[in-house]
Amino acid sequence: MEENYRRYPIGIQNFEQLRNRNCVYVDKTELVYRLANTDSVYFLSRPRRFGKSLLVSTLEAYFQGKKDLFKGLAMERLEKDWNVYPVFHIDFSLTKYTTLFDLQEQLNLFLLRCEKVYGAEKEEKTPAARLQGMIRRAYEQTGLPVVVLIDEYDAPLLDSNFNIPLQQELRNELRKFFSPLKGLGQYLRFLFITGISKFSQMSIFSELNNLKNISMRDDFSAICGITERELLDALRPDIERMALANGETYEAACAHLKRQYDGYHFSKHCEDIYNPFSLFNAFDAKEYKNFWFSTGTPTFLIDLLQETDFDVRQLEGVEATDEQFDAPTERVTSPIPVLYQSGYLTIKGYDPEFQVYRLAYPNGEVRKGFIESLLPAYLELPGQSSTFYVVSFIRDLRKGDIESCLERTRSFFASIPNDLENKTEKHYQTIFYLLFRLMGMYVDSEVKSAVGRADVVIKMQDAIYVLEFKYDGTAREALAQINSRLYAVPYRKDGRRIVKVGINFDSATRTIGDWVIEVEDTVDNL
């Protein structure tokens, strides 16, 4: 094996397998030890592919006393006793749930597997009774309290988002199955539940009034994912190889990784967290691709945005309260908590006076991927079409050919299906926003987010384009607004040529009607 070869834990969610294969592991065992020895009943919410299952597997190995797996890690010096507890681990992500039988079968397989070890009693007919009896017998046979690990508890409910009657059946089945846990405290050493949705939203563990939710706590905010300190300390060789493969400096590679995969915050004062799935895939491929987003298209979330008529332009910075995060899913009126828990938005700030969180896209990977998914939904065109147009727009601008760029924009809107003809001004504003925001993934562009700014500013190597749109107005009015409101003034000292473009959008033809271009060639020294 090459001296510099590194095996990354891509697709490996089992701690024992990861350690035996000598995969790269960022040591989280000090947090695991604190979690296991501070309290006994926990819940953790994190987005998909963020390390929840590996964390659960690490807890399983710890409670099973597998000391050898922790050699060289913080746990080796922290743990002295290494007791071997009976561990019941159920992972709900192992199958898809399209019927109630799918869930019942999964529960039965789990119970049968455990009953082979601890036995069964014929009086125990229901899954809940079997679970209760199994925990009691495990305690009696070993003399040690039981550890229960429930991974991705909400997988059945997320699979049934589009089938509300089925979702209610699945919710009731899960609620019945886990109901005995409340009365089994004397037999339990540790209970840990993970999922994407907060447990209070799904109304499954409502009877567990001692369940401690650590999802938004500072002290456990880094238990999943990779902090910037961990990246620079433990993964420095990987950054160096990444830089070498892409012909850039170490510092440039750090900046590229941060821009693409960093930016997650799961509490008020959380340090920056990198997406581990994307980071390890990037190191393995030595490319800055959109790895996390490519593993799942957020169809449900896009439908929710459209059903609630949410203005997607607000996703660059929107506020939410604690109460919104806790709203039951059947009463959700805002898509924001769902977008946060799914990983498409993250905490970017907190106002303690009003107890309000500011949320936004975490990083470039998520912003680009989500916008690329949103555009087809608003255009009713294939996603590749919008991306192809954006690339063509950029090529036109790099050649300084603003006329061709605008002609291409006109053709783009003309290609939108006729059934959008009754859409409102807001709908077309959203399309413009998404189109130019996607362009911002490739070039330096700004899209209007406040009064007193131009609709779009695009910065190319030799020119800055200031664009203003009017809906059923005139191009001259749009240009006049650029001049009267001094939209171009902040860029005059830049030294690049300033191109001001007034554009009219014609609702009758559903595309750009006309435009006016005005060029400033000299630097204003005001």
Predicted feature residues:
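Mg2+/Mn2+-dependent nuclease catalytic core
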Residues: 167-172, 471-488
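C-terminal amphipathic alpha-helical interaction region
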Residues: 444-450, 456-460, 491
